[in-house]
């Protein structure tokens, strides 16, 4: 005979496993710092200047960093020039804002990976800072 409490505990445990699996499949955006003033936020079509450090979620090993090159990375947001997790995770960002992006493999390099530094099916973690939006100014609000 089943005990109602045991059944409820089993259901809650199953639900927590399902939710954990779902969150591993979704982009996670952690805001680390937001400036007090934010007159302009990033949007699709903006030319962004970023600093970033990328690591593998499984072991924390660093695979790339603009800081190591002492040179910001520039790209156009939403133009497909970067992985999908960046195009999604860097929207509505303030200049000087810092975020931590945890990007599941299907929004990064997927089944192929990016050999030799990023294995297939890798979840990636990026610490990012928006240094500037090159094509817009405060007066364009």
Curated annotation (Swiss-Prot):
Primary location group: endoplasmic reticulum
Q: Where is the PPIase FKBP-type domain?
A: 45-134
Activity regulation description: Inhibited by both FK506 and rapamycin.
Cellular compartment(s): Endoplasmic reticulum
GO MF annotation terms: peptidyl-prolyl cis-trans isomerase activity
Q: Which UniProt keywords apply?
A: Endoplasmic reticulum, Isomerase, Rotamase, Signal
A Pfam family annotated for this chain is FKBP_C
Instruction: List the record's Gene Ontology CC terms alphabetically.
Output: endoplasmic reticulum
EC top class named in words: isomerase
What catalytic activity is recorded? [protein]-peptidylproline (omega=180) = [protein]-peptidylproline (omega=0)
Q: Which Gene3D superfamilies match?
A: 3.10.50.40
Alphabetical list of InterPro entries matching this protein: FKBP2/11, PPIase_dom_sf, PPIase_FKBP_dom
Question: Biological process GO terms, please?
Answer: chaperone-mediated protein folding
Known EC number: 5.2.1.8
Give the residues annotated as coiled coil. none
Keyword flag Cell membrane? no
Where is the signal peptide, in residue numbers?
1-23
Function recorded in the entry: PPIases accelerate the folding of proteins. It catalyzes the cis-trans isomerization of proline imidic peptide bonds in oligopeptides.
Q: Which family does it belong to?
A: Belongs to the FKBP-type PPIase family. FKBP2 subfamily.
What name does UniProt use for this protein? FK506-binding protein 2
Q: Which organism is it from?
A: Cryptococcus neoformans var. neoformans serotype D (strain JEC21 / ATCC MYA-565)
Query: Top-down, what is the taxonomic lineage of the species of origin?
Result: Eukaryota, Fungi, Dikarya, Basidiomycota, Agaricomycotina
Gene symbol of the encoding locus: FPR2
């Amino acid at each position: 005979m089943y005990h109602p409490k045991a059944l409820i505990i089993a259901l809650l445990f199953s639900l927590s496993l399902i939710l954990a699996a779902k969150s591993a499949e979704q982009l996670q955006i952690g805001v680390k710092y937001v400036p007090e003033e934010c007159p302009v936020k990033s949007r699709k079509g903006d030319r962004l200047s970023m600093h970033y450090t990328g690591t593998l979620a499984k072991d924390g090993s660093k695979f790339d960093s603009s800081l190591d090159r002492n040179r910001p990375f520039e790209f156009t947001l939403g133009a497909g020039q970067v992985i999908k997790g960046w195009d999604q995770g860097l929207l509505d960002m303030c200049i000087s804002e810092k975020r931590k992006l945890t990007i599941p493999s299907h929004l990064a390099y997927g089944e192929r990976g990016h050999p030799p530094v990023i294995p297939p099916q890798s979840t990636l973690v990026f610490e990012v800072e928006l240094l500037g939006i090159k094509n817009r100014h405060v007066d364009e609000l």
